[in-house]
């Protein structure tokens, strides 16, 4: 039996769980992001060992990129602009999709978020800008779009 399918089911379940949890609570708990990260690295080791280094670099670059944004904004504005769960979620997505897909993933997530802001403005006006916008659902959606290329097409 091919080991890919159980890994992809785990990826889908954890990503949907993170999508729903962040949309409802505004949090991305470690108990969901950490298993997603480790399962992504294990997936590469078991199913595609040639890409393990790329998956590891994906986790490092994903974490590092969003950590710089998180801390830079926090230092400059004295408040959070991006949750640290988003930092860990991008690290996990980097482990699954490798570093080569991270630019596309972040661009898609940001595009989805901008679209949601525009829809919110059109439907509720400026009131919609007063509430923080969870970024996790957009990362999860972008992960599924990018996953079509990176995971199902064999990287």
Curated annotation (Swiss-Prot):
Source lineage: Bacteria, Pseudomonadati, Pseudomonadota, Gammaproteobacteria, Enterobacterales
Organism of origin: Escherichia coli
UniProt cross-references to InterPro entries, sorted A to Z: Peptidase_A24A_bac, Prepilin_IV_endopep_pep, Prepilin_peptidase/N-MTase
Protein's UniProt name: Leader peptidase HopD
A Pfam family the protein falls into: Peptidase_A24
Superkingdom of source: Bacteria
Transmembrane portions of the chain: none
GO cellular component terms, semicolon-separated: plasma membrane
GO biological process, one term: signal peptide processing
């Amino acid at each position: 039996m091919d080991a890919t399918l159980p890994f992809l089911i785990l990826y889908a379940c954890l990503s949907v769980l993170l999508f729903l949890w962040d949309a409802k609570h505004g949090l991305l708990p470690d108990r969901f992001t950490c298993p997603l990260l480790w399962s992504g690295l294990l997936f590469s080791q078991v199913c595609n060992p040639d890409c393990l280094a790329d998956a590891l670099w994906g986790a490092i670059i994903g974490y590092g990129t969003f950590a710089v944004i998180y801390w830079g904004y926090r230092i400059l504005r004295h408040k959070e602009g991006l949750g640290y769960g988003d930092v860990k979620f991008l690290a996990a997505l980097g482990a699954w999709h490798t570093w080569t897909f991270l630019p596309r993933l972040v661009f898609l997530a940001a595009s989805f978020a901008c679209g949601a802001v525009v829809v919110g403005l059109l439907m509720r006006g400026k009131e919609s800008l007063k509430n923080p916008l969870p970024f996790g659902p957009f990362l999860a959606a972008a992960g599924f779009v990018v996953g079509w290329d990176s995971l199902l097409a064999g990287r």
